[in-house]
Amino acid sequence: MNTADDLANPLERLGGSVERVTFHSEASGFCVLRVKVRGQRDLYTVIGSAASVKPGEYVECHGSWINDRAHGLQFKAPQLKVVQP
């Protein structure tokens, strides 16, 4: 069943290669990644949670775009997993 929030902010999919791990907390899993998406020139900032993530790995994310006042456009991914490309 869809709620009003689900309809206002449907989850999008973003997948790509991790170019840089800007921040990763081993305690909470929270991470800030710079991701290269195929066919796109610029790197995207992805924030989410992952047990372990390294540059060169491929991540698949489900979330939504946010515009953070301090950090700009980011893809906030409650669902982030490392997968085989």
Regions found by a protein language model. Give the residues of each.
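Long, highly charged, low-complexity intrinsically disordered interaction regions
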Residues: T22-P85
